Amino acid sequence: MSSMQFSSVLPLEGKACISPVRREGSASERLKVGDSSSIRHERASRRMCNGGRGPAATGAQCVLTSDASPADTLVLRTSFRRNYADPNEVAAVILGGGTGTQLFPLTSTRATPAVPIGGCYRLIDIPMSNCFNSGINKIFVMTQFNSASLNRHIHRTYLGGGINFTDGSVEVLAATQMPGEAAGWFRGTADAVRKFIWVLEDYYKNKSIEHILILSGDQLYRMDYMELVQKHVDDNADITLSCAPVGESRASEYGLVKFDSSGRVVQFSEKPKGDDLEAMKVDTSFLNFAIDDPAKYPYIASMGVYVFKRDVLLNLLKSRYAELHDFGSEILPRALHDHNVQAYVFTDYWEDIGTIRSFFDANMALCEQPPKFEFYDPKTPFFTSPRYLPPTKSDKCRIKEAIISHGCFLRECKIEHSIIGVRSRLNSGSELKNAMMMGADSYETEDEISRLMSEGKVPIGVGENTKISNCIIDMNARIGRDVVISNKEGVQEADRPEEGYYIRSGIVVIQKNATIKDGTVV
């Protein structure tokens, strides 16, 4: 095995992009700028150049060489940047959402970030895991409505789940009634941060925080936030918006942006309609390298992910726009006129879980082969509550394109293109197709099940010979025998709480703890 040597060269002048190079014989292959592997190589080389102490203080270039033959030589060249973004100088604020009306009835007893997704995760696990995988471990979660299950999940997963915070922390800040206020609830995204500005200010002074990362708790994506923060630092931006290309059909659901050739945002329009929407169209051909047929995505949408300079955020919320309550609709459109507001275009998978339809479609997409998004990645895993459940037990089942979580009991059933949550029970002859079953909080013993059935009651799970399609089944639902749930008549909207279900965008949603009696047809 050849030995490896490290050599530092003189500081470079100027500012350039990352350019790691692997030499193989006489050829050189340049890694794509922004590629995750190149970013990891860059960070590793900085640590080696700086004795493992984190970001280098100067522009020293690190060259990794070998005493092997020239054909085997590996040169890792990190181009100069004046300032490397340090995750220790970043604090993340995750917004817990409002009343959750768009995801009702899933939010009838829980906050939006606590809604289960992907079989065993919660929506809050997405930004939390992205933070940890990005090296950001100073996190505030702001909650208000129905926050009990969210607080419990955060405590079990991130405060007692074995995750190593080193010098970091996770703090839950709940909306409270303040003296002299007419209402204690957050009146918007900016107002949520403003209500706890005194907590954040005290924290910033003690922890040398320079950048504030604002995140949403109702989205599905995997992102290295430090790439976003690095662009923020490189551009000397006051505010940086993470943006994504979107198509015509959903463009009016988002805040849309336009930016110039330097990346500076010159126009921001919150959920435009009609002519205002048409005016926000842009030429997205510059995304040819990243997505197929960019002409299908003629709009650039704000993801609701922002980076602020600390002092800029404090000034905007306390002084400049002290009476404004929302970042997207009020503060950002005004701030871009006298602040350096930059755009960071994110081209990987991103889904805003804003409605029952988008939530259902995002979950069903996880079942596709190959899926557009996967929770599993050994280098950037998603964390969730450790439940210590046994593997799922199945007997004579037919399963196709499905995700089956831990601790389930499946007996002579058929599952197709569906997600089955933890502790689910499906009995003989039951069929699920295009369905999401969230599972149960606890098991019922065989004796308990026998007793319930002898009393004419329904145990937790799906009963014998029940057929379910295009449906979301919330936690602890009790669905009897010979039930058919398919919305055969194509009803788009319906409220049937007394019968245990709602219909939203044609999707039947069985309520949490609902009981659907034997023989019911929906």
UniProtKB/Swiss-Prot annotation:
Q: Where does the record say the transit peptide is? A: 1-62
A Gene Ontology cellular component where this protein is annotated is:
chloroplast
Q: Which UniProt keywords apply?
A: Allosteric enzyme, Amyloplast, ATP-binding, Chloroplast, Nucleotide-binding, Nucleotidyltransferase, Plastid, Starch biosynthesis, Transferase, Transit peptide
Extent of Basic and acidic residues compositional bias: 28-42
According to the UniProt record, what class of enzyme is this?
A: transferase
Record comment: activity regulation = Insensitive to 3'phosphoglycerate and orthophosphate.
E.C. numbers: 2.7.7.27
The subcellular location is: Plastid, Chloroplast; Plastid, Amyloplast
Tissue expression pattern? Abundantly expressed in the whole grains, a slightly less abundant expression is seen in leaves, while a low level expression is seen in the roots. A greater expression is seen in the endosperm than in the embryo and pericarp layers.
Region span, Disordered: 28-54
* GO terms (BP aspect): glycogen biosynthetic process; starch biosynthetic process
Pathway involvement of the protein, from the record: Glycan biosynthesis; starch biosynthesis
Q: Which GO terms describe its molecular function?
A: ATP binding; glucose-1-phosphate adenylyltransferase activity
Q: Which InterPro entries match?
A: ADP-Glc_PPase (IPR011831), ADP_Glu_pyroP_CS (IPR005836), NTP_transferase_dom (IPR005835), Nucleotide-diphossugar_trans (IPR029044), Trimer_LpxA-like_sf (IPR011004)
Q: Which reaction does it catalyse?
A: alpha-D-glucose 1-phosphate + ATP + H(+) = ADP-alpha-D-glucose + diphosphate
Source organism superkingdom: Eukaryota
Family, according to the entry, reads as follows: Belongs to the bacterial/plant glucose-1-phosphate adenylyltransferase family.
Subunit structure as annotated in this protein's UniProt entry: Heterotetramer.
Q: Which PANTHER family match?
A: GLUCOSE-1-PHOSPHATE ADENYLYLTRANSFERASE LARGE SUBUNIT 1, CHLOROPLASTIC-RELATED, GLUCOSE-1-PHOSPHATE ADENYLYLTRANSFERASE-RELATED
Q: What does this protein do?
A: This protein plays a role in synthesis of starch. It catalyzes the synthesis of the activated glycosyl donor, ADP-glucose from Glc-1-P and ATP.
**Name this polypeptide is given:** Glucose-1-phosphate adenylyltransferase large subunit, chloroplastic/amyloplastic
| Species this chain originates from | Triticum aestivum
The encoding gene is: AGP-L
